Amino acid sequence: GLWKTLKDSAKSAVTNVAVTMLDKLRCKLTGGC
């Protein structure tokens, strides 16, 4: 239903943000930017 769709899209948005932030952090830590 609609609720599941909303939850799924929210979850994937949060995942995308987390992955992006982790990439930036790893970039800074390793100096591989």
Swiss-Prot record:
Its main location: secreted. GO terms for biological process: defense response. Signal peptide: none annotated. The keyword Disulfide bond applies. Expressed by the skin glands. InterPro entries: Antimicrobial_frog_2. GO terms for cellular component: extracellular region. The keyword Cell membrane does not apply. Disulfide bonds join C27-C33. It is found in: Secreted. Keywords: Antimicrobial, Disulfide bond, Secreted. Belongs to the frog skin active peptide (FSAP) family. Brevinin subfamily. Antimicrobial peptide. This is Brevinin-2Rk. It comes from Pelophylax ridibundus.
